Amino acid sequence: MSDPCGTKPVQESNPTMSLWSLEDRHSSQGRPQPDQDPVAKEAPTSELQMKVDFFRKLGYSSSEIHSVLQKLGVQADTNTVLGELVKHGSATERECQALTAPSPQPPLVPRGGSTPKPSTLEPSLPEEDREGSDLRPVVIDGSNVAMSHGNKEVFSCRGILLAVNWFLERGHTDITVFVPSWRKEQPRPDVPITDQHILRELEKKKILVFTPSRRVGGKRVVCYDDRFIVKLAFESDGVVVSNDTYRDLQGERQEWKRFIEERLLMYSFVNDKFMPPDDPLGRHGPSLDNFLRKKPLPSEHRKQPCPYGKKCTYGIKCRFFHPERPSRPQRSVADELRANALLSPPRTPVKDKSSQRPSPASQSSSVSLEAEPGSLDGKKLGARSSPGPHREGSPQTCAPAGRSLPVSGGSFGPTEWLAHTQDSLPYTSQECLDSGIGSLESQMSELWGVRGGSPGESGPTRGPYAGYHSYGSKVPAAPSFSPFRPAMGAGHFSVPTDYVPPPPTYPSREYWSEPYPLPPPTPVLQEPQRPSPGAGGGPWGRVGDLAKERAGVYTKLCGVFPPHLVEAVMRRFPQLLDPQQLAAEILSYKSQHLSE
C-alpha cells in the first residue's frame, strides 16, 4: 500500500526509523480528523504492524500493545506509548502478586539442594539461602540423640525433633538424621519407642534417612549406621552431632580420625531443651558460631574481664581486662625505659656541633695577617687571648680558643667590636648548654682561669656588659679607638665594661639577642677594684650555685628517666629546678615524641 506522496512504505527491517518517519510524516501532513476511527480508518495496516513489532521487541505482549494503541491511537508519541505500557505492565504485575500470595512457611523444611524450591517464596528467603550457604551441613546421629533424650532407657523421637528444630532456627537448611530402619517397626516391651510418628514426618520432609536392615532366617541383619553418619559428614565437610566418639571408625581411616576430632559436636538435654556447648573444641578453640560456619567470622581479640574488678591488686601484671583503667601500655616503668632506650636515636657528639663553626685558629691567623705595622702585634694578642694549650681539642671547652681581638689600623671601631662580641659570647653559652649540665661549673672555672686566676682581679659589674670583658686584664696598652678619641695616645686598653651605657640617641635593637650598640669610649687609665668572682653576692657566684643545684637535680632525675630525656627537658627549661615539675615535663615530652 502506498502513501499519498506515491512513495513506497519504509522497509520493516528497521522499525525504529520507520516509526519516527511515520510520526514526522503525519505531523507534516496536517491534523487528523477527530470523527474518524484512528486505528481502522486512518492508520494503514502496515504501520500498525510495524508499531506492534517494535514494541514486541521491547518485551511487551500483543494484547498489551493493541490495548494501548486503541487507547492512544497510532499517531501517539513513542514516549507516550512506552509510558502507558510501563504503567499497564506494573499494574498487571501487582495483580499477579496479589493472586499468588506466599503461603506460610512450614516448621520443617527440606534439606537444601534435594528438591527444587517453589516459585512462591518470601522475598527474605534468598538472604536466608545465602546465610545457609555459609553454614556447614549437619549430620545427626538419630539413635544417639533419641536415647539421650530418653535417659538411655527409651528411644524418644521427640529428642530428634528438638535437635532438628534448634538447627533450623539458626538458619541451617542442609540437615540429615540417620536412624536404623528397624525403628519403624512396632515397639516392643524390651525396646520402647515414644512419638514414633515424628520419624515418618521427618522422612516426608527429606530430613530423616533410614539405614537399611533386613531379616535373614528370622534374624535381623543391621547395617552399621555410624559409618553412614561419619562418611556423609566427611564427604560434605559437615558437622557430626553425637555424644559418641566413634573409636572403632577412627581406627579405620586416618582422615576420619582427624575429622571426628575436629568436627564432632556434643550436646546435652535440659528437660526439652537441646543445648550444644559454646566452645565445642575447648576453651581455646573456636566459638559455636564459627564452628558451624564454613568461613569463621573475625573474632574480637578482647581479654576476659577481671573477676576482681576494681579490687584487683595485681596492677599492670593482671592478665585480665580492666575497663576502668585508661588505655595505656601495660608495662612496668623499667620495661618502658628499656624500650625507650632501644627506640631513641643515638646522640651526636659535641664535637660534631663545634665542627660546624669556623675554627678559632683560622680566625686568629686571618686577623694577624690584616694587622698593620702601627697596630698591636697580632701574634702577641692571639697568645694573650688564647686559653692555653692544655684546653685545645677538649670536647668540653666552652670559651673559644685562639680567638683574638679585631685589629684595624691600630684602633677599634664600633663595627669591629660589635662583630667581635657577637662572635664570642653566643658560642660560649650555646656550646655549654649542648655539653650538659655538669659542664656549666667547669665552664665558669675555666673562664675565670683565663681571666687571670687571682681572686682579687676585677669582675663584671654591669649587667648588659657583664660577659664582654674576657680580655680586660690581659690586653697590653695600645692605641685604641682612634676614630672616636683622636687626642688620646697609647694608653691602657679598656674592655666594653668600662664604657658608659648607650645613650638614647642610638637606634633600638631589632632582635632581643643582639648586643647593645656601643658609644664612644671614655679614657680609663686604671681599672677599679671589683669583688672577687668567688663572692656569693656577685653574679658569677650565683651562677656557680645554680650549676651545682641543677647538677643535683639532673642526677636525681637520671635515676628515674633516661639521661637524654632529662638533658633535653632541662635544656628547654634552664631556670626550672623543681624535680616534680621537671618530671611532669619529661613525661609530656616523652609522650609527644612517642606519638610522632
Swiss-Prot record:
GO BP term, example: nervous system development
A Pfam family reported for this protein in Swiss-Prot or TrEMBL: RNase_Zc3h12a
Record-annotated RNase NYN domain positions: 135-290
Record Gene3D superfamilies: 3.40.50.11980
Outcome of substituting residue 111 to A: Loss of MALT1-dependent cleavage and degradation in T-cells
Result of altering residue 136 to A: Reduces MALT1-dependent cleavage and degradation in T-cells
Ranges for region RNase: 112-281
Known outcome of mutating residue 439 to A: Reduces its phosphorylation status, does not interact with IKBKB/IKKB and BTRC, inhibits IL6 mRNA instability and IKK-mediated degradation of ZC3H12A
Region annotated Disordered, chain positions: 1-48, 97-134, 278-306, 340-417, 511-543
Broad class of where this protein is predominantly found: nucleus
Biased segments, Polar residues type: 10-19
Recorded superkingdom: Eukaryota
Family per record: Belongs to the ZC3H12 family.
Summary of subunit composition and partner proteins: Oligomer. Found in a deubiquitination complex with TANK, USP10 and ZC3H12A; this complex inhibits genotoxic stress- or interleukin-1-beta-mediated NF-kappaB activation by promoting IKBKG or TRAF6 deubiquitination. Interacts with IKBKG; this interaction increases in response to DNA damage. Interacts with TANK; this interaction increases in response to DNA damage and serves as a bridge to anchor both TANK and USP10 into a deubiquitinating complex. Interacts with TRAF6; this interaction increases in response to DNA damage and is stimulated by TANK.
PANTHER family referenced in this protein's UniProt entry, alphabetically: ENDORIBONUCLEASE ZC3H12A, N4BP1-RELATED
Reported function: Endoribonuclease involved in various biological functions such as cellular inflammatory response and immune homeostasis, glial differentiation of neuroprogenitor cells, cell death of cardiomyocytes, adipogenesis and angiogenesis. Functions as an endoribonuclease involved in mRNA decay. Modulates the inflammatory response by promoting the degradation of a set of translationally active cytokine-induced inflammation-related mRNAs, such as IL6 and IL12B, during the early phase of inflammation.
Protein name: Endoribonuclease ZC3H12A
Species this chain originates from: Mus musculus (Mouse)
Gene, per the UniProt record: Zc3h12a
